[in-house]
Amino acid sequence: MLGWVQRVLPQPPGTPRKTKMQEEEEVEPEPEMEAEVEPEPNPEEAETESESMPPEESFKEEEVAVADPSPQETKEAALTSTISLRAQGAEISEMNSPSRRVLTWLMKGVEKVIPQPVHSITEDPAQILGHGSTGDTGCTDEPNEALEAQDTRPGLRLLLWLEQNLERVLPQPPKSSEVWRDEPAVATGAASDPAPPGRPQEMGPKLQARETPSLPTPIPLQPKEEPKEAPAPEPQPGSQAQTSSLPPTRDPARLVAWVLHRLEMALPQPVLHGKIGEQEPDSPGICDVQTISILPGGQVEPDLVLEEVEPPWEDAHQDVSTSPQGTEVVPAYEEENKAVEKMPRELSRIEEEKEDEEEEEEEEEEEEEEEVTEVLLDSCVVSQVGVGQSEEDGTRPQSTSDQKLWEEVGEEAKKEAEEKAKEEAEEVAEEEAEKEPQDWAETKEEPEAEAEAASSGVPATKQHPEVQVEDTDADSCPLMAEENPPSTVLPPPSPAKSDTLIVPSSASGTHRKKLPSEDDEAEELKALSPAESPVVAWSDPTTPKDTDGQDRAASTASTNSAIINDRLQELVKLFKERTEKVKEKLIDPDVTSDEESPKPSPAKKAPEPAPDTKPAEAEPVEEEHYCDMLCCKFKHRPWKKYQFPQSIDPLTNLMYVLWLFFVVMAWNWNCWLIPVRWAFPYQTPDNIHHWLLMDYLCDLIYFLDITVFQTRLQFVRGGDIITDKKDMRNNYLKSRRFKMDLLSLLPLDFLYLKVGVNPLLRLPRCLKYMAFFEFNSRLESILSKAYVYRVIRTTAYLLYSLHLNSCLYYWASAYQGLGSTHWVYDGVGNSYIRCYYFAVKTLITIGGLPDPKTLFEIVFQLLNYFTGVFAFSVMIGQMRDVVGAATAGQTYYRSCMDSTVKYMNFYKIPKSVQNRVKTWYEYTWHSQGMLDESELMVQLPDKMRLDLAIDVNYNIVSKVALFQGCDRQMIFDMLKRLRSVVYLPNDYVCKKGEIGREMYIIQAGQVQVLGGPDGKSVLVTLKAGSVFGEISLLAVGGGNRRTANVVAHGFTNLFILDKKDLNEILVHYPESQKLLRKKARRMLRSNNKPKEEKSVLILPPRAGTPKLFNAALAMTGKMGGKGAKGGKLAHLRARLKELAALEAAAKQQELVEQAKSSQDVKGEEGSAAPDQHTHPKEAATDPPAPRTPPEPPGSPPSSPPPASLGRPEGEEEGPAEPEEHSVRICMSPGPEPGEQILSVKMPEEREEKAE
């Protein structure tokens, strides 16, 4: 009957083994059921439970939820224990009645079909025994039985069932926080310990309400055995008064009062604030411990059914400080206010989805799951830590099974589960309305931590091990939002070691209102701090958990702190660099650092010409060809394989032009000799075979041209060059040229068989004139001086017209008869030459010709005159055009020269300047062939101009150091803007102080940079490839004036780039612009750096002192300076010492200059002025030169030593001098930074003696 219910309702994931007691119960035919009375729930608890369930899911809770008995009902049951004893007899009689048996059978069947909650963890056996033997939990059986006996009537039972479901439908206020503060005493399992004196007396009854009526204690192993009564706590006076005020049991007024009382409890009541501050703020919290008994042989790792409940305290903001072991007390009234605001919560959809999954599994294994065993759980005592926490607001441990369950949930499963759940709920609701609801364990936030005994309890033994669960993150995940960060110190380990599972809890707020995916959970885990990171670890009896946990926390914290420190240091470094860059830009906006300057595009090498690559390709081919002759083996050049091209380019292929030359020669043979053979008697039977041989050779050339060459010529169609063989052949066959070529090869030679060999039959061979014109155009395109060929061709036209006229004259003479008249040819001499002479005189109309006598002669002569005038006029005009085109450049040059000379004469320019201008015209014309190259480039497109500029100027511009590293395309654009200018010898290219608007690149020749005081000293000579004028052109540092004079040394050809053109180019290349400015700034800085000029000696360095003079000075020193000679010698001696001092100072100055120049080469920046000033000061502060002892007489004479201490070390000492002739030499800075003053001082006494 209930098979469909079993298939519809979800079943537990595993089927545990049946105990012996269960087997015995199944054998019994009619088990006796203890009368169970639905206890009256506490109003506060009932309201709390009704709040935890939304209205839309109430119908589901009607089937599975059971209300806990309230403390007041428990007290009433304890006071009326005698009434319960009397009611047992009536209960047994009612149970034995037929209607009661049907209900009992129906209840037993439903209990077997409806799945029971599955729990995975148990307590220690010691704790279970303690719960069962003594304590407050043992007091729940007797009063419950008494109440059951009181409320066993079916009508009253139905009312209780309606009331219970009404309470679950309507929202209720949250449970007082006092209950949660008193629960840890029960969770410890120490029943023998009395309650603390400071706690109120109502603690015991409220804790009894935590027990479910269907959870018997583990002590009574037999169903009918009753536990020993434990001393019950004193009931409240208020509850006693309430009990005593009610009417008798059978009175109808009692029923009405009871209904009104139940309605009051069912309807929502105002929130009553509990007592606060009963727990000391510094008292340590206790970890949540759940003790669950696992039957032997069951699943080792049972699947846990998890439920997600939205926490009401997610958005709460309270000032709560944490202690190392637990959280501080939260005011109860604040928590209740927050709980009222968060009353509507959603129940998890996981249960519905799990039911669908289990339904599919049970359909496949229908036969095996008909006999479902009940899971026997010893007890479920859950203690929560914290003040102001409601039962539904506890945190739930997050385990690996939770994560697997989240992964299994999908969007499609949600929709299907909701649809199926609605259909099933309607069917189940109709059937459950006819029977009593079953006693189920209340579904809470932690379904894996709560359990329920179906029929009887089994104590924990060796066969029934226990596993203790500890919530290790009680302080890291407080129930209320805290301002202070959670403590990273782990709580002390649990006393149980080998059977403890450490489950750190995680804030459930991260999983609310949606089912997170695997990626979302990974991101949330990464976002957690080391104290909040969920870690699941099985304890090891050999490893202390506290040390391991602290090490993990410390290592994680140290890793995070190291990463944060590295990141902060990196940010500080970046900020410093950015600050320095901003400062640098504020000081000089044009300054760019090396990092900002773009990396120049790698300079691509110009493509190598094709002839250079061909030998490289041919080398490996040559290595393969060897020739073995006799005893030696040598390599020989392989035979080149010539293959006729598949297509021929008629514009650039020189072989085709050569072939056209042969075709034109054949055509000229026919055009010149056919008239001669027809008119003159030069073709005779004796030489006929020679004439025919040449004729047919020309015909073969014609035929090859038509069949081989013309059918392979490329052509342009739609802008594309067609190289397909079929298309080229079709193109030729459809052209006019093919028709003319075909007519030129008409086989009229077969008529020779009838009329004989007549040259006029070959006259169609002259129709191949189109090949002649094509040859002329191709030849002119490849000739450097095409006008020469044009002149020759024009002359040929004139000669051919004379040739035809001579042939006609001989034919006319032969027609009338040779020598018949005075006008005709008389037949004397060479007939062709005499006729040709007559034709020349006739066409040119020289005169002196014989007068025609006959009509034929007159008509023929008139035709000659008209032909001659027309032909010669055309020839002369064409000749003029040809010659004019050949000398057009020279004519332009002369016209420009004449205009310039006329201009200079008009303004009376000096002859020297005029001569320089004329020289420039002549040199420019002869060197370039034109005066201005830009005029030639104007007609060409940009691409061709760029190609020409690259070939002409790229090799020179690429050598310029200033443009190295710049964009290659920028250099190409710059090449098109360059102008070529020729400078004559000693011409000033630019002068110092002028405004710089151009930059110069030397193409050919040399220029000299002048400087010095007079501005005529040659500082440096620049050769081809050098550049100057770029600093003023780039206007770096605000200066755009020339810094030196530049003069052309000889004829110099320069490329000029205007400032305007360069700026237009650099606009499109900002990276190259920065690079050029940076280079120009460095060059300007190096040029402006003060260079130390070599000190000019007052007196030139003297030559070495003669030995004889030194000997004389030595003798004078001995004599002691007596007489005039002694005074003169002393004066000379002092003079020599001055010269020696000057020489030493000059050497010291040279050493200083060398040191500073080496520093400049290394690139060290800084002013050299301070260095220049330090040395003179040191020399000025030097003490006087020490007096040298007199020189011994036998010492060899040598040059006197310098008096300055600044001479280089290692220099040999001079000869010893007398003391009275010592002097003091000082170096002091001059008024200008680069000047120094040398002063020579003598003591006053010595000066007097010297005088």
UniProtKB/Swiss-Prot annotation:
Residues 23-50, 353-373, 424-434 have a biased composition (Acidic residues). Residues 786-885 are annotated as: Ion conduction pathway. One of its GO terms (biological process) is protein localization to organelle. SUPFAM superfamilies: cAMP-binding domain-like, Voltage-gated potassium channels. One of its GO terms (molecular function) is intracellularly cGMP-activated cation channel activity. Its main location: membrane. The record marks 872, 876 as: Central gate. Residues 557-567 are annotated as: Calmodulin-binding CaM1. Changing residue 848 to E: Increases the affinity to Ca(2+) ions. Does not affect heterotetrameric channel assembly. It catalyses: Ca(2+)(in) = Ca(2+)(out); Na(+)(in) = Na(+)(out); K(+)(in) = K(+)(out); NH4(+)(in) = NH4(+)(out). Keywords: Calcium, Calcium channel, Calcium transport, cAMP, cAMP-binding, Cell membrane, Cell projection, cGMP, cGMP-binding, Disease variant, Ion channel, Ion transport, Ligand-gated ion channel, Membrane, Nucleotide-binding, Olfaction, Retinitis pigmentosa, Sensory transduction, Sodium, Sodium channel, Sodium transport, Transmembrane, Transmembrane helix, Transport, Vision. Residues 1-656, 710-724, 774-785, 885-1251 are cytoplasmic. Residues 888-964 are annotated as: C-linker. A motif (IQ-like) lies at residues 568-578. Belongs to the cyclic nucleotide-gated cation channel (TC 1.A.1.5) family. CNGB1 subfamily. This is Cyclic nucleotide-gated channel beta-1. It comes from Homo sapiens (Human). The lineage of its organism: Eukaryota, Metazoa, Chordata, Craniata, Vertebrata. The gene is CNGB1.
